[in-house]
Amino acid sequence: TVYFADPELQLDVGSIGKGYAVEQCAQAAEARGLTSALLNVGGNVRAIGTKPNSGPWVAGVDNPWPDQDGQYATARYVDTVELQPGQSLVISGDYQRYFTVDGVRYHHLIDLTTLQPARYMNSVAIVSSDSGLGDALSTGVFCMPVEKGQALIEQLNDVEALWMLSDETMLQSSGWGK
């Protein structure tokens, strides 16, 4: 239990809480003998083993860009990822949780340098061997310039990323899809 002396102080674990919970559930299920499953908890996807036919689990990366009518078609994917046993796919983006005021869209991922919604990209997908780490990285990388995020991801072992930019182009880390 954590207590704060200042009653106005709050701790929001939203950027890692779901990923951590998914990882703990997956590990508990594996410890109890589950050998094949794909957990999907609100966009945090975690592979347990392989599919029953021994093939890899495949997860889609949502399309973060609106169509001609301004609608977001998250049923369309811009890429798919083959997840190895124990791998997770976690995506952070500006296209699901937002509101619009005077034609300006405000989403929930805040850039700490501006205290405004981060505007470096539309979405970033992270593949890692820990869903909690993937969740933290997807939020953090979303809130930093692409070049800094690329440098960070390339320094990490067993972590890959796909960036979806506002000009509808994509950048990927050196090991994405391999």
Explain the meaning of each model-derived region:
Residues 1-178:
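Mature catalytic core of soluble alpha/beta enzymes
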